[in-house]
Amino acid sequence: MKKIQSVRGMKDVLPSDCKIYSGLENLLSSSASQFGYREIRTPILEDSELFIKTIGDGTDIVEKEMYTFVDSKKNSYSMRPEGTASCARAIIQGGLTNTINKIWYCGPFFRHERPQ
């Protein structure tokens, strides 16, 4: 029987590392707030068209590196490979284009490439 392991390029963050990650995130949040930045959180899953339009249809990211699937209604969704496009979409969709100009974000991003 095949031994089930994490997917290549994906990493478990175990309790000892979670403490470090949390500390760094708290430091980032505190520092960003002092300079007027506001946190934003976007979905991990986005309409694939968002990345095709913003990153470019012929780029390696779109053609080779995104984790994409099509649902039963033929909608194409991708796990976010980067954060800029999702943040821009959220600000526009949320009607915040005239009220917010300094944001920060953190979170997982997904690309099918060799782990570093």
For the regions a language model picked out, list residue spans one by one.
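TRNA-recognition modules of translation machinery and tRNA-sensing kinases, especially anticodon-binding
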Residues: 1-116
